[in-house]
């Protein structure tokens, strides 16, 4: 199953995308379609001696820029690399699409081309965070800044299914991000969502606070995209600042430098644990297919890992299982509508 890579997205495209794709093909044996300017992509491939790898090129004559309007770009730039990557998924030529380009356009392209899973109102962008207990999935981290309670409940359903079947967590616990653990805490949105989640068959643990994310108190944390994006950017900034401060302290003291020599292995393992490149990208969950959104400044390692995670996601059966779990909890979502359970599709 091939993975389509938007090779023209990102701050350093197409060099980084091609380097990451070549690494993924070499290391994991994943067949890849590079989508973008054919001449430029062939030139980049020549730099990596990739003639023996299962990498093909699908020409795209347009590129969606970082400052383009997401919806307009997807509709007007029909031959853009990000849209064509999702078209390849729709046509069955690829199992997943990966892009480090305009995240809004990537989300819009996924929704416009692949559509949403039946019953899902809003797809969500999910991000894996390292924790003291392993890893925690947080969603939404930027796709939907204004949400209703039904959206957050659907995020919880999607998060539990993804954590179980794509991340391999047997019975993931779900927490709703709030400003306290008591049911009386939160705002109108979280209190309404909390009440609905308690009626579902999900493994719901109640409210969690920001500090619980890195403790690993639960394996899935649900929030709206505004809060989630703040959490994500704060975490990235904190990790970067911590590393810089630590390096400054070590380099400013001779004894600290000597101690570092003995602890170098531990520092390298820690750096690997908190390095976003190890997690590749953030899956767009809730569309009828697989899309992976990468940081615009991703390096080749991040692209390589995003391709691997996208391929694993595509083979996990998550999309079908989300529809089934949604049907199972439809009564809690819409208790007074009298509507029948939507068909699993």
Curated annotation (Swiss-Prot):
Recorded catalytic activity of this chain's protein: a fatty acyl-[ACP] + phosphate = an acyl phosphate + holo-[ACP]
A single GO BP: fatty acid biosynthetic process
Entry EC no(s): 2.3.1.274
Subcellular localization, as worded in the UniProt entry: Cytoplasm
Cross-referenced InterPro entries: FA_synthesis, Phospholipid_synth_PlsX-like
Recorded GO CC terms: cytoplasm
Entry keyword annotation includes Phosphoprotein: no
UniProt keywords, alphabetically: Cytoplasm, Lipid biosynthesis, Lipid metabolism, Phospholipid biosynthesis, Phospholipid metabolism, Transferase
Role summary: Catalyzes the reversible formation of acyl-phosphate (acyl-PO(4)) from acyl-[acyl-carrier-protein] (acyl-ACP). This enzyme utilizes acyl-ACP as fatty acyl donor, but not acyl-CoA.
Protein name: Phosphate acyltransferase
Organism: Trichlorobacter lovleyi (strain ATCC BAA-1151 / DSM 17278 / SZ) (Geobacter lovleyi)
């Amino acid at each position: 199953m091939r993975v389509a890579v938007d090779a023209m997205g990102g701050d350093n495209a197409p060099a980084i995308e091609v380097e990451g794709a070549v690494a993924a093909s070499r290391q994991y044996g994943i067949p890849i379609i590079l989508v973008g300017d054919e001449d430029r992509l062939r030139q980049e491939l020549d730099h990596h001696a990739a003639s023996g790898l299962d990498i093909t090129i699908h020409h795209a004559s347009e590129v969606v820029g970082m400052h383009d309007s997401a919806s307009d770009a997807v509709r007007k730039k029909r031959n853009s690399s990000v849209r064509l990557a999702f078209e390849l998924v729709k046509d069955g030529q690829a199992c997943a699409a990966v892009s480090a380009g305009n995240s809004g356009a990537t989300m819009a392209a996924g929704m416009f081309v692949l559509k949403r899973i039946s019953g899902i109102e809003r797809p969500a962008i999910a991000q894996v965070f390292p924790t003291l207990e392993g890893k925690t999935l947080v969603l939404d981290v930027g796709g939907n800044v204004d949400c209703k309670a039904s959206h957050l409940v659907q995020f919880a359903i999607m998060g539990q299914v993804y954590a179980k079947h794509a991340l391999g967590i047997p019975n993931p616990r779900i927490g709703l991000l709030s400003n306290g653990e008591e049911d009386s805490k939160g705002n109108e949105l979280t209190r309404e969502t909390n009440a609905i989640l308690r009626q579902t068959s999900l493994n719901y643990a109640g409210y969690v606070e920001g500090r619980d994310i890195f403790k690993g108190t639960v394996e899935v944390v649900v929030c709206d995209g505004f809060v989630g994006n703040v959490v994500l950017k704060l975490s990235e900034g904190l990790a970067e600042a911590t590393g810089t401060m630590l390096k400054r302290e070590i380099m400013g003291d001779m004894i600290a430098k000597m101690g570092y020599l003995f602890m170098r292995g531990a520092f390298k393992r820690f750096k690997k644990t908190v390095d976003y490149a190890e997690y590749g990208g953030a899956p767009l969950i809730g569309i009828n297919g697989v899309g992976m959104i990468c940081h615009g400044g991703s390096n080749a390692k991040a692209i390589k890992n995003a391709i691997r995670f996208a391929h694993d996601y595509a083979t996990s059966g998550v999309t079908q299982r989300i529809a089934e779990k949604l049907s199972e909890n439809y009564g809690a979502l819409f208790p007074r509508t009298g509507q029948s359970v939507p068909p699993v599709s």
